[in-house]
Structures are given as structure tokens and as C-alpha cells.
Design a protein with these regions (language model features):
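Non-catalytic C-terminal accessory region of glycerolipid acyltransferases
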Residues: 2-4, 17, 34, 53, ...
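Membrane-anchoring hydrophobic helices of lipid-metabolizing enzymes
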Residues: 3, 10-149, 182-186, 193, ...
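Surface-exposed charge patches
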Residues: 82, 160, 187, 249, ...
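Catalytic core of membrane glycerolipid acyltransferases/transacylases, capturing the structured
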Residues: 105, 141-201, 215, 226-232, ...
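Flexible, active-site-adjacent loop/turn segments at secondary-structure boundaries
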Residues: 114, 120, 124-127, 133, ...
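A conditional alpha-helix N-cap/helix-loop micro-motif detector
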Residues: 125-128, 152, 178, 199-203, ...
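Short amphipathic alpha-helical segments and helix-helix/interface helices
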Residues: 135-136, 159, 185-186, 209-210, ...
Length: 323
């Protein structure tokens, strides 16, 4: 689920000296939008290969292509390095090592997603689950449940995991870049009983989300790459960072339970970790500053998970205010 559709600069080779960056300086010519390769045509091709090729073969091909991509477009690779630097104390060599792992991990993540959306059996993809008691307690409360997650691991797999346990999940997404990709991915989720709530086309979409949460539904929201209209400044790894204030806005509107969650790949399977709910005093959320503080608390709750799995924190556009 790519939550930052915008004009891409990919395709213009970044000058070699732009790949030399330090945490205190702004590198030149970093790509600000999603890759031109991320579109319906490539996604359909990936779904086709997922049906035709063995998993291991497809993952080997995907890994080779992703590593080639990182070489051909050094600006994209440098973007990831810059995103990782604050989490490793500004150590360039460590950030580059994490970045190399991240590109390899991303290729496997995408193949897993293609296989899922192609309708292939994925029963053996899930591993450890922690914090399930937090989710069950939230369900018993009768309030809506908002699952808040970063772009970490394979966040899309939270929906089929809950479906396996008899729970329905509504997934919030922005319109995907290009023509037809939103509908393609929406249809794939629908075949698995997962409903997609697309923000950006229908001005009443946010009202529909509020209505569902008020009715006790479970909704998933990505917090760490918001559109400008819902971005608020918080701190992550000691840096200024834009996070989505939408979770706090929905808490104010519906009194929903906020559950931070993340799904990293560990030992060949995806673990699901549900953290304790982030508590709040609803009347105070009338103040925007209080909503910003609540957003900060949600981000802070997820920060240790991101730090522990940096090689699976998938951001290919700049995430820091200084960039």
C-alpha cells in the first residue's frame, strides 16, 4: 500500500556525488515520488509470474532485479541510506549495510505480496503472534478498533491473518499512482474478504471510516508516510518526522481503541505483534496540540520495533524534514 502518490523523479540518473551524504546535510537530487516502475502493468506482470514460477525461482529473479535497480538509480539507494542514518546514530557504514539488506528484503516482500494477491495458498507464511490478548480485549469493548502500523515488514498481511481468525478488517489506502492499480489491488483484497477504503477520490470517504468505527469495525491505518493534508510534525530517532494525525482525529471523532501493530519477517515467516493500546482522554483531543501529542505517543510506541527491524522499514522517498 503506497501512501504517497506523487510525481516521480525516477528515471533521471542522480549525479554520483549526490550519493555522498551526511546526516547534517541535504543530499542533492533525491527522488521525491514513487518509482515509475510501480504501476498496474508491472503489478499484473508480477501476479502472472507468481502463478507461473516456483516461489524460490521468482524470489531469486526479483532479488537480482532489485539489486540492479539500486545500482542503476543511486539516488533511490541514497534516499534509503539517508532515511536509515538517524536510527543508527549517523554511522554511514552501518546505514549502507542496512540499506543493502533492505533492498534484498523488499524483493522478497513484494513476491510474497504478489503470491497472496494472485490467490496462492499462504497458510504457512505466518509465524509467532504476540499481544493477541490486546486485540481480543479491544473487540470485547464494543468500540471501534484502529490498528496503526508503520511501513514495516509486510503490513498488508495483517488483513488475511485476522480473516483466518474470523475477524474482518477494513484497510485505509490512498489512491495508488498510475491508472488501474488502485482497482487491481482493491479487487485482490476483496477476493479475500478484505474491504479497501480509498481516500482521495470520495470526499465523504473519511465520514464512512468514522461511521464504521462508531459501529465497532476494525480498521487499519499506516502512520508513517502521510499526505501533506494529514501530516503533523513529531520526533522519531531524534529527528523531525511527519506522521499522520488521522489516528488521533479518528480517536477524537469515534473514541476508538488505538492498537499499534507491526508484522516483520523473521526466520522465513511473518510475525504479528500487537502492542498495548495507546490510551487517551477523549475530551482533551478537541485541542489540536493534544492530537499531535497523541500522534507522538503512537509513533514512540512503534519506534523500538522500527529500530529492531530497520532492514524492513520500506521508505524509498525521503522521510525526514531536513530532506
Amino acid at each position: 500500500m503506497n501512501l504517497e502518490p506523487s510525481t516521480s523523479t525516477l528515471g533521471t540518473r542522480t549525479p554520483p556525488d549526490a550519493a555522498v551524504g551526511v546526516p547534517s546535510s541535504k543530499p542533492r537530487a533525491l527522488p521525491q515520488g514513487p518509482s515509475l516502475f510501480y504501476g498496474a502493468a508491472l503489478w499484473r506482470l508480477g501476479l502472472l509470474f507468481a502463478r507461473l514460477l516456483p516461489e524460490r525461482a521468482l524470489k531469486s529473479i526479483a532479488a537480482a532485479l532489485v539489486l540492479l535497480y539500486a545500482r542503476v538509480f543511486p539516488g533511490r539507494r541514497e534516499t534509503v541510506v539517508q532515511n536509515i542514518l538517524p536510527a543508527v546514530g549517523g554511522h554511514r557504514a552501518r546505514a549502507e549495510a542496512v540499506t543493502a539488506k533492505l533492498f534484498r528484503q523488499f524483493s522478497g516482500k513484494v513476491v510474497d505480496l504478489w503470491r497472496f494477491e494472485a490467490g496462492l495458498p499462504m497458510d504457512d507464511i505466518f509465524g509467532e503472534m504476540t499481544g493477541w490478548d490486546h486485540f481480543l480485549a479491544a473487540q470485547k469493548s464494543g468500540r471501534g478498533v484502529l490498528l496503526v502500523t508503520p511501513h514495516l515488514g509486510n503490513w498488508e498481511f495483517g488483513a488475511p491473518l485476522l480473516t483466518r481468525h474470523g475477524f474482518k478488517l477494513n484497510v485505509i489506502t490512498l489512491v495508488e499512482p498510475g491508472h488501474g492499480l488502485t482497482e487491481l489491488r482493491q479487487a485482490a483484497r476483496a477476493r479475500c474478504g478484505i474491504e479497501t477504503l480509498v481516500i482521495g477520490r470520495d470526499p465523504f470517504a473519511f465520514v464512512e471510516i468514522i461511521r464504521r468505527l462508531e459501529a465497532g469495525a476494525t480498521v487499519a491505518l499506516l502512520i508513517d508516510r502521510p499526505p501533506k493534508t494529514s501530516a503533523v510534525e513529531v520526533e522519531l530517532f531524534g529527528e523531525k518526522f511527519s506522521a499522520s494525525i488521522a489516528a488521533a482525529e479518528l480517536a477524537r471523532a469515534t473514541n476508538c481503541i488505538l492498537l499499534p501493530v507491526y508484522l516483520p519477517r523473521i526466520g522465513g515467516k511473518y510475525a504479528a505483534h500487537i502492542l498495548p493500546p495507546v490510551e487517551y482522554d477523549r475530551p482533551t483531543l478537541r485541542d489540536r496540540a493534544a492530537r499531535q501529542q497523541l500522534t507522538q505517543r503512537v509513533v514512540s510506541a512503534l519506534e523500538p520495533a522500527v529500530r529492531a527491524h530497520l532492514e524492513q522499514w520500506y521508505h524509498f522517498v525521503p522521510v525526514w524534514k531536513r530532506l
